[in-house]
Structure formats: C-alpha cells, structure tokens
C-alpha cells in the first residue's frame, strides 16, 4: 500500500475516490449500526468536512502488525463506508449513529499533516492545530485519508447450516 502526503496525492483512477478514514478496534459491517462519540480534534475535523455535505467516511480496523503512519495506526485494507444519522453536539463531544454501507478496498493512504498528540483532558481546537501545518500542507488534514475503490456487492445466498459450519 503506497503512502502519500497531502502535497503529492496522485491523480485518481476513474473508480477511485478519496475518503476520510476512522480507524478503530471494532468491526462495523454493512447494514450494521453503532453509536459513536467523537472528542479528538482529528475526527472533529473529519466530521466538519463531511457532515454538511452528507458525505460518508470509511470505518476501518487498525492492523496491529503494521508500523504506525505519522503516529497513527495503519488499518487493514478493507473497510465500510459510513453514513451519519442523529448527529448532535453534547458539550465538547459529537455524537452520532454510524450506519455501515458499501465495502471498499484501500489502494493508498494519505497521511495526516500532523502526528496526533495525546492530550490529558483538555484538547486544543481544530483551528489551533490547523495553524500548525497550513503553510506547509495547505491541503492537509488531521486525519488519515484513503484512496479507495468500492468492492462489488455480494450476490447470492448461503445456506444457514453451511454458514454456521463456516463460523464454528
């Protein structure tokens, strides 16, 4: 998987798109739902970038066998697009319902403009962090992005007995 920064993003192929990635240790499958609470500035910036335009983000699982990318966990190469519902602010947190959608494969990663910092209980604002990189990386983001392509939907049915056997 190739890794780019915001100043050297390649031209996209027709079937590719750039998608913000939310890397977690939990699964979200197509048609699943999960309540989310966001408090980190990088993911607040991500939500600012997508919510107003009704765009999805990519829910991916961190891959512990890979080295970190600019201080961020590298994900496995398959994820699920997420549509956001019931978005609300609660104090300094953003809450929403994540709805799993189409599966995608990550072809390349775009690293964040800054390494994430681990703050105690008081986080800086997104604007304060953007000021740290905006001159060097005007197209940069605090979060990881992926150059992705959609995976075709699965077609057909599987017998329940066979499915249970495969899972056991």
Language-model segments: residues:
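N-terminal low-complexity, acidic/polar interaction/targeting segments
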Residues: 2-168
